[in-house]
A protein has these predicted regions:
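Glycine-rich, acidic/polar active-site loops that bind/position phosphate-bearing ligands
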Residues: 1-258, 272
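Hydrophobic alpha-helical segments, chiefly the membrane-spanning helices
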Residues: 260-263, 267-272
Length: 272
């Protein structure tokens, strides 16, 4: 059974309506285009999908905008956030005229680095274990205009809010300066949201380990296992995606949602 056949079977088994093609831009931000399943078959999965590369900052000029998204069929997952059942695939970006990897595609850069490592005899496998951390704020303001430039962040955990008036009262449960590592709730106000972020990551196939509050107020860490370069880079993109999506969901209703968790599943295709 080919990988494309396995993907088509997964689409059928999970009643998939859309296939989301995802790639990373030069700034490290994940981008996507969503294809209806009527456009998906073994042939299209093998040939790839055309898109406008000139609209991605730092890539092609308008007169050479055509580029190809080539799905990586060895790993896919059902997106747990989308209302419609959607299968997501990581993609490489190719030059359509030659079929070669595009030099400014981060995934292609990673593959070129691995090829150089092997060719130079430096090693045959490289493992990476990033320790990603982030802050959660209730309010963020940014302004750059003709007469001023400013930013301001706000968090209920911030010591600067110890005398602030809240409608429900100021309960005073917040870490002091450099006091966030690692008291239990209610001082740690992020227990549930971090747990949901980590669970969603696991749903999408990321090998997770732990989560905890970090030293600073509003600072958090999710732990995942190390892996090879491409695997870890893909996992880190899913890390960021999970953090942003879950935080956005909590920002809308201030409670756990586990959006469409019934649709969630993951598949790692065996490498050939």
């Amino acid at each position: 059974m080919s990988d494309a056949k396995a993907i088509m079977e997964m689409i059928k088994e999970n009643d998939i309506t859309y296939v989301d093609l995802r790639f990373t831009d030069p700034r490290g931000k994940m981008q996507h285009v969503t294809q209806h399943i009527d456009t998906i078959d073994e042939e299209s999965l093998a040939e790839g999908f055309m898109f406008d590369g000139s609209s991605i900052a730092g890539w092609k000029a308008i007169n050479e905008s055509d580029m190809t998204l080539m799905p990586d069929l060895y790993r896919c997952y059902v997106d747990p956030f989308f209302a419609q059942p959607t299968l997501a695939l990581f993609c490489d970006v190719l030059e359509p005229s030659t079929g070669e990897a595009y030099s400014r595609d981060p995934r292609s850069t990673a593959k070129a680095a691995l090829a150089h490592m092997e060719a130079a005899g430096l090693g045959d496998t490289a493992f990476f274990g990033p320790e990603a951390e982030f802050f959660i704020f209730e309010d963020v303001k940014i302004d750059v205009s003709m007469n001023r430039a400013m930013y301001a962040v706000d968090s209920v955990e911030g010591p600067y809010n110890s005398a602030r008036d809240y409608e429900e009262g100021n309960l005073g449960h917040r870490p002091g300066v450099k006091g966030g590592y690692f008291p239990v709730p209610p001082i740690d106000s992020g227990q549930d949201i971090r747990g949901e972020m980590l669970s969603v990551m696991a749903d999408m196939g990321v090998p997770v380990e732990k989560h905890h509050h970090e030293v600073a107020p509003s600072q958090h860490e999710l732990g995942m296992k190390f892996g090879t370069l491409i695997e870890t880079a893909d996992n880190l993109q899913l890390y960021k995606y999970s953090v942003h999506q879950v935080a956005a969901a909590y920002g809308l209703d201030r409670k756990s949602t586990r959006l469409n968790s019934s649709h969630s599943s993951v598949s790692r295709m065996p490498s050939s």
